Design a protein with these regions (language model features):
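Short, recurring structural edge motifs at helix starts
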Residues: 100-105, 182, 261-266
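A cross-family detector of function-defining hotspots
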Residues: 2-5, 18-82, 91, 103, ...
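Preference for well-ordered, secondary-structure-rich cores of eukaryotic proteins
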Residues: 96, 256-257
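Amphipathic/hydrophobic helical signal segments and adjacent flexible N-terminal regions
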Residues: 3-9, 178
Length: 341
């Protein structure tokens, strides 16, 4: 099948005859569907993504529930057709035969990293690189993964960029600057500066949640979460003992958040790649770890005033969330610095 015609299916619904014809053409047996669990407290829709593939044909199609894709309320999940959002073309991949059809942009599975970059040179200003390379075309985003050494293509993934969430319909309160937030790290809950900065966002109504969980969750609508802690050696939490440990800033849709509307430390942007982070921080991270099970990574930079913790996506090579952490927080390891879950 011509790759241009195949990629034209991105954005179409699973009930579209052209989509069904394509799945039949590649002998894909399963059909996309949301996962339902009526007994799950977060259900009944517990998974809005669905992937269907033919391993023998080396191709896989990804779909998402239409309501989830367009950012509608969770009560709408499962009531709309699913949107085709991505297509994988596999090369040297465990358990999957190589795709035998034409690849987009004249790519070949035998191409090495340098050749792939040359063939996609027209999109060079959009390239984000790390373990994989990612480019933006006018219609979609393409990610190319390589075998060890970059000698040939492991897979090429073409995916739609997520649409923006629907507008809120009301104005947000002004958010404090990142400089102001950093200055408050380690401050006690009764510090007037804490309330000057965060009361306009609704901090007072989260007092009980802070006492119970140590967290103030402003992810929706502010893209912000605050972690508080009680210093070691104390037992009963209180305003004079509870201190601001960290602040985490979220990209849109990350952990159900809306985008943090303020600035980020060191001029970081949510669209930055891991390579761009090193340039902006001025040096490699002090600690770094990638998790290929969920295609994310985390990097830490320690400074006397605060620690910067960045979680990024290794499939699209973009920052997902950024945390600033008090220097005396006791959090010196990566495993404890992923922010609120």
């Amino acid at each position: 099948m011509n790759p241009r015609n195949l990629l034209a299916l991105l954005g179409r619904y699973n009930v579209d005859p052209a989509v069904e014809e394509t799945l039949a053409h590649f002998a894909v047996r399963n059909r996309p569907e949301v996962r339902v669990d009526d007994e799950d407290p977060d259900g009944p829709i517990v998974e809005t993504y669905s992937w269907v593939k033919n391993s023998r044909a080396g191709i896989e199609f990804g779909f998402q529930d239409g309501a989830a894709w367009f950012g509608l309320d969770e009560t709408e999940f499962g009531k709309h057709p699913m949107v085709m959002t991505e297509i994988y073309f596999y090369g040297e991949h465990v358990g999957v035969r190589s795709y035998q059809g034409q690849l987009p942009f004249g790519l070949e599975l035998s191409d090495d990293r340098a050749t792939v970059r040359k063939k996609l040179i027209q999109f060079e200003p959009t390239r984000h690189s790390y373990v994989r390379d990612t480019w933006d075309t006018p219609e979609f985003r393409i990610t190319v993964a390589y075998t060890d050494g970059g000698n040939c293509i492991r897979f090429a993934l073409c995916m739609l960029r997520e649409p923006p969430l629907p507008p809120l319909g009301y104005a947000l309160a002004p958010v404090p600057s990142v400089v102001a937030i950093v200055r408050l790290l380690g401050a006690t809950f009764d510090d007037p500066g804490i309330h000057w900065a965060f009361d306009p966002l609704g901090l007072r109504r989260l007092t009980d949640a802070i006492t119970e969980t140590g967290q103030a969750d402003f992810r929706n609508p502010y893209g912000l979460a605050l972690d508080f802690t009680v210093p070691e050696g104390t037992h009963s939490p209180g305003a004079k003992k509870t201190r601001l440990l960290s602040a985490t800033f979220f990209e849109e849709r990350e952990q159900g958040a809306r985008t943090w509307p303020g600035e980020l430390p060191y001029g970081i942007r949510f669209g930055d790649s891991p390579e761009a982070l090193v340039q902006k921080l001025g040096r490699p991270p002090d600690m770094q770890h990638d998790n290929e099970d969920n295609f994310t990574g985390v990097a830490l930079w320690h400074e006397p005033e605060f620690t910067t913790n960045v979680v990024y996506d290794t499939m699209e090579n973009r920052v997902l969330r950024v945390s600033v952490i008090a220097p005396d927080s006791g959090r010196d390891g990566l495993s404890n610095c992923f922010g609120p879950q």
